[in-house]
Regions:
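Short beta-strand elements
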Residues: 123-219
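Exposed beta-sheet edge/beta-hairpin loop segments within beta-rich domains
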Residues: 7-8, 70-143
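Short, small-residue-biased leader/transition segments that mark boundaries at the very start
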Residues: 2-11
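Extracellular structured ligand-interaction cores
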Residues: 2, 34, 105-107, 146-148
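Beta-strand-rich structural segments
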Residues: 12-17
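Extended, polar beta-sheet/loop recognition surfaces of beta-rich domains
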Residues: 22-72
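Extended, compositionally biased non-globular segments
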Residues: 19-22, 95-97
Length: 220
């Protein structure tokens, strides 16, 4: 399952076609030693109001991923019942992706590697980076999961709009804000096919009324 929080996407659980949690199949009985998720952006292009950049096809400039798997896998550090071990044993059943560029569209290729004997790179003695499984690793294993998810990063979480919680959208004329605010609202309009008023309402709800999901709703 995926959870989007601002410019971050949290990876939590994997389910089978019956809706049954199957994380344990990739962790227990030594399976954590041969499994690792990889996340690779492909087919990158700017959104309707974005601009192409020279490094758009450099995965490290587009996304960042942090493996935050825990031991035990079904406990949380928040409850002080587990330790984060993703750095020394990356699996990717728990992790956070940060989208580093705004106004980009791409396919996020998510793959779960299953090594025949190991998930370590025998040439480097380390684990391959989250965005690029090596050729030798691919030769020595297979994919348990291989899928693409379309991603649109339509604006930056640092962008602001010159309205407050009590602003009445009815009283704000289209393009009646400052230049940066107008651009942000038009990005929302174009992405979700909304009117100026609808986009302004959505921004106010998201910014002021949706609650602080980062204050503890997602626990590792």
């Amino acid at each position: 399952s995926l959870g989007l929080v601002g410019s971050e996407m949290c990876i939590r659980d994997t389910y089978n076609s019956k809706g049954e949690l199957m994380n344990n199949q990739f962790i227990e009985n030594g399976q954590d030693k041969i499994h690792q998720h990889f996340f690779t952006p492909e087919n990158v292009k700017p959104t309707f109001d974005g601009q192409p950049e020279a490094d758009d096809n450099d995965p490290q400039k587009l996304v960042d991923y942090l493996y935050v798997d825990t031991t035990p896998w079904d406990k949380t550090r928040h409850d002080k019942e587990a330790e984060i071990t993703g750095g020394s044993n990356p699996v990717g059943l728990k992790g956070v992706i940060r989208f580093l560029k705004d106004r980009k569209e791409f396919d996020l290729k998510i793959r779960l590697y299953h090594g025949y004997k190991s998930k370590g790179n025998p040439e480097t003695g380390t684990f391959d980076p989250f965005y690029k499984p090596s050729g030798i690793l691919i030769q020595r294993g297979t994919w348990d999961i291989n899928l693409n998810i379309p991603v649109v990063v339509f604006w930056s979480r640092e962008e602001t709009v010159g309205v407050d919680e009590d602003t009445n959208p009815e009283g704000v004329e289209e393009d009646g804000l400052d230049e940066k605010s107008n651009r942000a609202i038009h990005s929302i309009m174009g992405t979700f096919n909304l009117t100026w008023k609808e986009a302004l309402e959505e921004f106010i709800i998201y910014t002021y009324k949706s609650g602080d999901v980062e204050a503890g709703a997602i626990w590792l």
